């Protein structure tokens, strides 16, 4: 389905499915994670997500109006950017964090590169990385609570991955259900997987990128994580942090992924290895956002190496 939005090497595929339809389906698929975030972190989480969505839509509308461009706020792409950005924020973040992030995502990453289909990075993830670098304290404060479900504590509000990196064990059921610390939309693997199954059933996304991403990450952890084939540690890494949200909803972004099937497999492997590299050998316990951003920048190279050879190209020239 990504062929609708992707400016890529030929061959180009025609489809009757509209961009508007695809965006609405992704929005629906993100609802379980959004609802779970509100249940675990309270109404403040919903406020941050709504602020993020409103800022993204408003920024896109204002920019396109001022630049005398056709309004695209109704296609749903800005809403998805706002949703993903909001779900990648800690519930304790101040109100101005999603506002700054939303403006950066739409104005800098998306519109200044030409709008939908032209941006070279996932706008929501680029904004999250920008916020992490610029407002580290606000973006790494995971002490929020106040939801309908009591959160399982680790150490002073640390995320499960931080606890794992410190040598602690974390509760796998809490990681699966989501009643633990983390960003608003990443804690519940169950809610994310419900949305992922929805997208797969309706063929909104392809299995190749998320499955090769998660699979290659698992292999990397087994080989280099220092715990061998320890199933408990592997599940902590798979269910903790932003891997599930990143693999199913951000690595599959239509604009910033390869269009060829071989390219998608290569892309997934690269993301899995980069995430493992950042998590295991990096200073931070997480690495999904940076891995996907680096992967986005490699898309032209991946496509150049994996694009099918045109019929008749590369044949042997016979002398007359």
Where are these regions (language model features)?
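Structural signature of hydrophobic alpha-helical transmembrane segments
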Residues: 42-55, 92-101, 175-189, 231-243
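Loop-to-transmembrane alpha-helix initiation sites
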Residues: 120, 124, 234-242, 264-266, ...
